[in-house]
Amino acid sequence: MRLVLLGPPGAGKGTQALRLVQRHGIVQLSTGDMLRAAVAAGTPVGLKAKAVMESGGLVSDEIVIGIIAERLDQPDARKGFILDGFPRTVAQADALDKLLADKGLKLDAVIELKVDQAKLLDRILNRAAEAKAKGEPVRKDDDPEVFKTRLEAYNRDTAVVAPYYSARGQLQQIDGMAPIEKVTQAIDSILETA
């Protein structure tokens, strides 16, 4: 099973990806997590990405595609994967199609979590408050100003990825504002027919 989860920041892509990993034994390939790990490790890619990520901007396609290509070659990705936070641009979607074709693979599903963007800031603030209450660090990208920058970048650059996949007949849409379990059930229904 190979799939892409689309939606703006705070839509629940990471939450649903984790549930899919637990239910289906596939790996979550979150560019955000991979980039944060590279930043924490101080790798050359991480150093390049750090300043861009902290300001809420998008990391270059070259860096992200390189990380994805390397990750797809790892043994645990052979059973299947979920791409969360990638592709973020039509150029990345096209590059992903080419990368998968070169590896003899294709996507089984592209699922967009449709959300009310006016309510996303509340969702992000709740996520930050929950992290604080648990004594966990708050993600830098959960800062309200950084979140607004990320949402603007999504609307400017990434929102066009859904129509890219829709034009190819690959896009399925789900109400991302529904309760978490309902969203999971809707995704499972799509995957049963994929």
Swiss-Prot record:
Residues 126-142 are annotated as: LID. ATP binds at residues 10-15, 127, 178. Disulfide bonds: none annotated. Keywords: ATP-binding, Cytoplasm, Kinase, Nucleotide biosynthesis, Nucleotide-binding, Transferase. AMP binds at residues 31, 36, 57-59, 85-88, 92, 139, 150. Residues 30-59 are annotated as: NMP. It comes from the Bacteria. Transmembrane segments: none annotated. GO terms for cellular component: cytoplasm. It is an enzyme of class 2 (transferase). One of its GO terms (biological process) is AMP salvage. Its EC number is 2.7.4.3. InterPro entries: Adenyl_kin_sub (IPR006259), Adenylat/UMP-CMP_kin (IPR000850), Adenylat_kinase_CS (IPR033690), P-loop_NTPase (IPR027417). Pathway: Purine metabolism; AMP biosynthesis via salvage pathway; AMP from ADP: step 1/1. One of its GO terms (molecular function) is adenylate kinase activity. It catalyses: AMP + ATP = 2 ADP. It is found in: Cytoplasm. PANTHER family: NUCLEOTIDE KINASE. Belongs to the adenylate kinase family. Monomer. Catalyzes the reversible transfer of the terminal phosphate group between ATP and AMP. Plays an important role in cellular energy homeostasis and in adenine nucleotide metabolism. Consists of three domains, a large central CORE domain and two small peripheral domains, NMPbind and LID, which undergo movements during catalysis. The LID domain closes over the site of phosphoryl transfer upon ATP binding. Assembling and dissambling the active center during each catalytic cycle provides an effective means to prevent ATP hydrolysis. This is Adenylate kinase. It comes from Azorhizobium caulinodans (strain ATCC 43989 / DSM 5975 / JCM 20966 / LMG 6465 / NBRC 14845 / NCIMB 13405 / ORS 571).
